């Protein structure tokens, strides 16, 4: 896709595009950590129980449904001077800054429901930002750049998570760190997001309008009216509200009746029994709400959504690819769903130690894994990279089982001396557990490689006319594991213990690899012709 740059800059356009992708990855990763592991660390320090923290991972629900409003971001242009993508970027980033500032002013213990609603709002804005960033990145990069571009995106993304996850944990350690409060951290992150909005407005290149796809019958079809788009979106929102109310008032009693005999004979606490009921009701509600929302979109003639998704689903094998997208990161997501509470509460590591190892050292290894994964993809190809990196991801979960079973001090550790780098400092030397360091190193290195290959796979499935809608749908399905396993993970960890929990996470990584083996020829053809129609 050509860049709308002055002609004298076009020889540098390819390098600049890759730089832009890394910067956008940073903007994407910052709020994700603040509604994920950083939020879990805040709740852990406030004394919230593991099962409740697991259910609060549902604040990330907007990530799984962002394809519902992605068509509006594909359809409407806010400010012609900024262009379609940059206009939405500036709006979402400014709103994120405001949302983070409000969250910092809300105590989680005293106003947990308000706190959760604000976190959902931040996740909605973050997911909306991701819709634009994913589409912008896919439009910006040529097919040959997508492997390296995916690696650079992970680089920026993980750097942001080092800041909002790792450095933030060191800041909040009262003994070894800076002794900041979590509200102070979130106010600083709000200021950074405001700065990102300024950069989006002045530094990002503007893309030229996409040309019609050759032979695309949709290219000559008039765009649906703005009225239909808005009414269609409102119809989908109404369906989701109906689904929520039905889950609350109908499916919860049904779940109680179904699980009652088993729960009465169990040794689980009353609170944990209630969580199992909530979990079953949640799954039933999801099975009801998604078809209802699809029906509402069709009845309301939400054509921008239906055409974008129809273009993808009209291709042979599309449903199988979606199943693979859900499964590929499932085991990794299950193991990592409550990793921060596991390390802080179950293993009793200090905030500074977790911040240094899991978020700083570990994320640098993830960056190395992402860059190594991008380079290996040039030689391995997409299918072999997905298979190899998927096997490594599954194997890395065994390390957490070992850590939970053996406990602290199983391997010799090391001492991190005190330092002051201005942005972050340690007031005294901090011991680092050797077992923790080894497990985090393996997990982050393999996870970075797997993420790079997975992003390249997602970009290969989209068609440019519907980039935002299709990529939002695909990445939303990819986030199903990360968001939806949280409630199950919290309940399961308290029910069967952490060692068995991590064995389950390893087993959950295997179905995707079997499916990938069955799809070998299809993925290889997709790698040869990115963006081409899928085949059986």
Placement of each model-derived feature along the sequence:
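Intracellular loop-helix junctions on the cytosolic face of multi-pass helical membrane proteins
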Residues: 1-15, 105-114, 143-324, 516-536
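Pair of pore-lining "gating" transmembrane helices in MFS-fold secondary transporters
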Residues: 10-45, 238, 314-335, 441, ...
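Short amphipathic helix-loop junctions that connect adjacent transmembrane helices
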Residues: 36-52, 251-270, 328, 337-355
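Loop-to-transmembrane helix entry/capping segments in MFS-fold secondary transporters
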Residues: 50-51, 143-152, 351-355, 464-474
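Helix-to-loop junctions at the C-terminal end of transmembrane segments
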Residues: 65-82, 368-388, 403, 407-408, ...
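C-terminal ends and interior cores of transmembrane alpha-helices
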Residues: 89-109, 391-429
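Intracellular juxtamembrane helix-capping segments at the cytosolic ends
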Residues: 127-141, 339, 449-463
């Amino acid at each position: 896709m050509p860049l709308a740059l002055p002609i004298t800059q076009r020889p540098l356009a390819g390098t600049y595009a890759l730089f832009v992708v890394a910067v956008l990855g940073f903007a994407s990763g910052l709020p994700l950590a603040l509604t994920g592991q950083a939020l879990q660390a805040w709740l852990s320090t406030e004394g919230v129980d593991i099962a409740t923290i697991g259910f609060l991972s549902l604040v990330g629900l907007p990530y799984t449904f962002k394809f519902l409003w992605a068509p509006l971001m594909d359809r409407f242009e806010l400010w012609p001077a900024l262009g379609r993508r940059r206009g939405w970027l500036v709006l979402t980033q400014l709103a994120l800054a405001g949302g983070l500032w409000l969250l910092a002013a809300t105590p989680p213990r005293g106003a947990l429901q308000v706190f959760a609603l604000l976190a959902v709002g931040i996740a909605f804005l973050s997911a909306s930002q991701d819709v634009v960033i994913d589409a912008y990145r896919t439009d910006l990069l040529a097919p040959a750049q997508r492997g390296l571009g995916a690696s650079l995106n992970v680089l920026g993304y993980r750097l942001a998570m080092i800041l909002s996850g790792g450095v933030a944990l060191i800041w909040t350690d009262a003994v070894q760190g800076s002794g900041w409060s979590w509200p102070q951290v979130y106010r600083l992150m709000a200021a950074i997001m405001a700065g990102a909005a300024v950069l989006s407005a002045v530094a990002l290149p503007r893309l030229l309008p996409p040309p019609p796809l050759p032979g695309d019958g949709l290219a000559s079809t008039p765009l649906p009216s703005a009225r239909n788009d808005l009414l269609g979106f409102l119809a989908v929102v109404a369906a989701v509200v109906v689904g929520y109310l039905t889950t609350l008032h109908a499916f919860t009693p049904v779940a109680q009746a179904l699980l009652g005999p088993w729960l009465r004979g169990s040794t689980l606490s009353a609170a944990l029994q209630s969580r199992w009921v909530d979990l079953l009701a949640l799954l039933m509600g999801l099975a009801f709400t998604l078809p209802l929302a699809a029906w509402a979109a069709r009845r309301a003639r939400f054509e921008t959504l239906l055409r974008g998704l129809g273009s993808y689903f009209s291709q042979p094998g599309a449903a199988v690819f979606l199943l693979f997208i859900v499964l590929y990161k499932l085991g990794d997501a299950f193991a990592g769903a409550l990793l921060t509470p596991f390390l802080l509460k179950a293993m009793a590591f200090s905030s500074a130690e977790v911040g240094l190892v899991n978020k700083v050292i570990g994320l640098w290894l993830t960056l190395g894994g992402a860059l190594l994964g991008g380079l290996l993809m040039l030689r391995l190809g997409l299918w072999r990279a997905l298979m190899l990196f998927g096997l490594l991801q599954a194997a890395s979960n065994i390390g957490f089982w070992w850590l939970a079973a053996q406990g602290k001090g199983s391997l010799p550790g090391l001492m991190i001396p005190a330092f002051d780098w201005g942005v972050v400092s340690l007031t005294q030397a901090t011991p680092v557990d050797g077992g923790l360091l080894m497990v985090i190193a393996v997990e982050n290195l393999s996870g970075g490689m797997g993420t790079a290959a997975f992003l390249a796979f997602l970009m290969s499935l989209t068609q440019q006319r519907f980039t935002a809608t299709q990529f939002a749908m695909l990445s939303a399905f990819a986030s199903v594991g990360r968001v939806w396993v949280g409630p199950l993970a919290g309940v399961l960890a308290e029910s069967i213990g952490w060692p068995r929990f991590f064995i389950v996470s390893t087993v959950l990584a295997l179905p995707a690899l079997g499916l990938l083996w069955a799809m070998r020829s299809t993925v290889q053809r997709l790698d040869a012709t990115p963006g081409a129609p899928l085949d059986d």
